[in-house]
Design a protein with these regions (language model features):
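Extended helical coiled-coil dimerization/tether regions that scaffold
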Residues: 2-15, 22, 143-249
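Walker B catalytic acidic pair
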Residues: 257-258
Length: 398
């Protein structure tokens, strides 16, 4: 059951289907990003890949600005989008250098009254002030400024627990749902959390891990960052859909810059799976540098940003899954690393070895091999191949 509007009408789900961008920073000519799944429906996961300074954050900010409640630090740009429910609604937004902005055509429509976008930048830090002192009403502000903090997750959890103990029914449901999220595996090794009060009446949250109980502020930064934005998102969904049996399963749009930031490789492999399970009706549009993120997803809409001298072009492959690709194949073909997946030292030694073979110079080949032998993986099959190649040059013994 979704949140009711004042006139008792339920706002329909609204998602992005396309984004057209022109003359925005590194994007010069008009280009359109398809945000659908190829079958006319919005893709649940769109992943934007590109080198540093190729416009990943710019694209997320362009999308965020279409939530008319959030206009922070505008820059001149022209972009348009289609918002989808049962039909497409197209709007064109112009933001000038002066800071003024306007929609060039009709934007607001009762059919998209429920459109709210949640955005999270790379500095996903929890606020340390109390909830009553500082409430960030702009749901995408951290995308525009690293100084913007997210909800004080620990205090929100403590306040919710206090409300539960005072018999607030809605609080009990919310606490149960956020516990389900945080112990679902989205935080590796975290199996539970509890509320603790010291003798001097200071309260805090302790997370149960394989290594014992750990306070939230003592967890690694990847854990703190994940708790910060996931709890922030959950709180906003609880408030947006107060009448829903499960607000976390309601429609929303979430933008995350560098979703793999501070996550170790195994965590990167599973993060999409966990977020999809906990927020099944959310459209995620995220940027990433991780081939593991690309490899792990079952059905993704991939956006590749490719630098071309003084501008960036947008390319979208037809494939929707890369689960059968190796990490090296993703790095080579999608992230354009080529031989850069190997160290410069390795490449130089291989070149030296090959040149020695061509010149039939055993001494130089042996010198290159000895250095390669030190840096190759202990179980590398290449070591045996190099020895076989070198044996053809081995001096005959009498």
């Amino acid at each position: 059951m979704r949140q009711k509007m004042a006139n008792n009408a339920t706002p329909p789900p609204a998602y992005f289907k396309t984004l057209t961008i022109e003359n925005v920073k590194c994007f010069k000519a008009e280009q359109t990003i398809d945000l659908s799944d190829g079958n006319g429906k919005p893709a649940q996961w769109t992943i934007i890949l590109g080198d540093n300074n190729t416009g990943k954050t710019t694209l997320l900010r362009c999308l965020a600005r279409f939530d008319f409640r959030t206009f922070i630090n505008p820059r001149e740009n022209s972009s348009e989008k289609k918002i989808s429910h049962d039909e497409s609604i197209k709007s064109h937004l112009l933001i000038k250098e002066s800071g003024t902005w306007k929609f060039k055509d009709r934007f607001w429509d009762e059919k998209i009254a429920g459109l709210i976008i949640y955005g999270y930048g790379t500095a996903r830090r929890m606020d340390t002030s109390s909830l009553s002192e500082k409430e960030n009403k702009y749901a995408t502000s951290s995308l525009f400024s690293d100084d913007m903090t997210l909800i004080n997750a620990e205090e929100w959890l403590l306040q919710t627990d206090y409300a539960v103990k005072n018999g607030v029914k809605a609080a009990a449901s919310r606490l149960a749902k956020i516990k389900q999220v945080l112990t679902s595996g989205i935080l590796p090794d975290v199996t539970d959390f509890r509320f603790t009060t010291t003798k001097d009446l200071k309260s805090f949250v302790e997370f149960k891990t394989d290594y014992g109980s750990v306070r939230l502020n003592e967890l690694g930064y990847g854990y703190q960052s994940m708790v910060a934005w996931v709890v922030d998102l959950a709180k906003r969904l609880f408030e947006r859909y107060p009448e829903s049996e499960n607000p976390l399963a309601e429609p929303s749009i979430v933008l995350v810059d560098e979703i793999d930031l501070h996550l170790h490789p195994e965590w990167q492999r599973k993060i999409i799976q966990f977020l999809t399970a906990q927020f099944p009706s959310t459209q995620f549009i995220v940027s990433s540098h991780s081939p593991l993120i690309v490899q792990s997803a079952n059905n993704i809409n991939l956006v590749l940003l490719e630098k071309q001298s003084d501008h960036v072009t947008i390319r979208q492959p037809n494939l929707t899954t890369y689960q059968g690709w190796t990490i090296e194949e993703i790095l080579n073909e999608l992230m354009d690393l080529g031989e850069k997946t190997l160290s410069d030292n390795y490449l130089a030694l291989i070149k030296q070895f090959d040149e020695a073979l061509d010149k039939e110079d055993y001494a130089k080949a042996k010198a290159a091999y000895d250095e390669l032998d030190k840096i190759l993986h202990p179980e590398s099959s290449q070591r045996k191949l190099l020895r076989i190649q070198m044996s053809s040059l081995m001096p005959e013994t009498v």
